[in-house]
């Protein structure tokens, strides 16, 4: 067996944000997955896996079900992160409070932190306790407006390519009317650009259609904005890589997430791919007007 780093993904996040989908997705990608791992046993488990030489990538779910979770998870994650023989990523799944409460009500489950009280109380306490953990995550995914199928596709893009060591960019379009994406590192508002929505022959098309792309990008304002955006990213992306960031989510927003944001996101994705970056394009709200 060729000596190489063992890939380790730690899956955590808000209760109800999609950890079960993440488990099944990584299993489908060939990861050996352990649910409800005690943080204090994680390094010992990793050593056993390395000694066995049976697996080259593993995932561990760590969440509040484990006693002492909030006190132990970050110190143990940092210990694993420092090891030269491991490629460790911390994945944090999130969603807004309304979505989490709705999911709990659909399943008729109580929240682990408020088994006898209001679901909202448990969600708010969990979010407060998770602040430091989320800030240390390598990858944060907001599942608020994401179907299980689309979450699986995003995880496949993140963990199914190459060796997983390269910097990875997700370019997302969205509509402000549906809420800001919680997982965005950079948010650009393009609502100031000419809006194809008011052109009858373009209204029912999207930024995936050449006619809409041409309409948006023929504007001098759009051309100038895009040049500045590219210049910004030419400085920012190498800086993020130098700081050790493994992935970056760039969110482009317009009113409904159909025309302008999709156009800019597509163009930016194509240009970043030409420069050699690994890019996934995700149009969060493009189906909502249908």
Curated annotation (Swiss-Prot):
Keywords: ATP-binding, GTP-binding, Nucleotide-binding. GTP binds at residues 63-66. It holds the Pfam family PapZ_C. ATP binds at residues 13-20. NCBIfam families: PRK05416.1. Belongs to the RapZ-like family. HAMAP family: RapZ_like. PANTHER family: RNASE ADAPTER PROTEIN RAPZ. Displays ATPase and GTPase activities. This is Nucleotide-binding protein Lreu_0386. It comes from Limosilactobacillus reuteri (strain DSM 20016) (Lactobacillus reuteri).
């Amino acid at each position: 067996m060729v000596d190489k780093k063992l890939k380790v993904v730690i899956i955590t996040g808000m209760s109800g944000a999609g950890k079960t989908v993440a488990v099944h997705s990584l299993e489908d990608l060939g990861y050996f997955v352990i649910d409800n791992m005690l943080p204090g046993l994680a390094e010992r488990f990793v050593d056993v896996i390395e000694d066995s030489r049976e697996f080259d990538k593993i995932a561990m779910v760590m969440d509040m079900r484990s006693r002492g979770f909030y006190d132990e998870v970050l110190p143990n994650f940092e210990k694993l992160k420092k090891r030269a023989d491991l490629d460790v990523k911390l994945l944090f799944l999130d969603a807004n409070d309304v979505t989490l409460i709705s999911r709990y009500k659909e399943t008729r489950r109580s929240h682990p932190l408020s088994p006898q009280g209001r679901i909202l109380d448990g969600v708010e306490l969990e979010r407060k306790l998770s602040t430091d953990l989320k800030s240390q995550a390598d990858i944060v995914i907001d599942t608020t407006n994401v179907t299980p199928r689309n979450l699986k596709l995003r995880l496949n893009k993140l963990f199914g390519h190459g060796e997983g060591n390269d910097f990875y960019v997700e370019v997302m379009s969205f509509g402000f009317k549906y809420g800001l994406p919680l997982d965005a590192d950079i948010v650009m508002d393009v609502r100031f650009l000419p809006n194809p929505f008011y052109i009858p022959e373009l209204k029912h098309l999207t930024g995936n259609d050449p006619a809409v792309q041409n309409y948006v990008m023929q504007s001098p304002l759009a051309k100038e904005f895009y040049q500045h955006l590219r210049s910004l990213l030419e400085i920012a992306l190498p800086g993020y890589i130098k700081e050790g960031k493994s992935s970056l989510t760039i969110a482009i927003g317009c009113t409904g997430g159909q025309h302008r944001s999709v156009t800019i996101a597509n163009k930016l994705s194509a240009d970043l791919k030409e420069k050699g970056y690994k890019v996934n394009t995700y149009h969060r709200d493009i189906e909502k007007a249908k």
